[in-house]
């Protein structure tokens, strides 16, 4: 019951955050986002407490970093004169992705062959898509960094799906990875494609919070494998 209650709390607080995000600025935006972030970390802790294990603790560390990233990225909008907020937020999210990857490999074991295939698939797919839309988007000097990020994002998502099928990884983690994939690709179009609209931001944030909830729920499933 507690897990259901926390899931509802994440959904409600995220809905309030998204509502305020597309309509206003200021402390209420950061406060509601922080509440949603704290809620999905707490949900992860509760899920992990039912079946603790090394992989689950690594995943929980990733969720905490996601919470830190959330708070600092929104603080960077409230206090744009503090450039360190943006850097800390981006670094926290980068380490969260690394923590999730580490947790998956602790839970299921690392497969160089399947990861290599996923990496090749990710690179080919990202290159094909971004080159196809390049003329419609303004990447500036960030085109190749965007290609690298999109390649890794696609590769890890594909790898998690493979490990769900052959390695017994929690299905909720693969779903979460897929939602993160959608959310982050939307960000590319928001930043470089002139799609910074209320509708796109709502879609981006909705898939992001849904991804974090899926990650949190998966902690018990991850821990059961180690």
Regions found by a protein language model. Name each.
Residues 1-226:
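Polytopic alpha-helical membrane-helix bundles and their juxtamembrane interface segments
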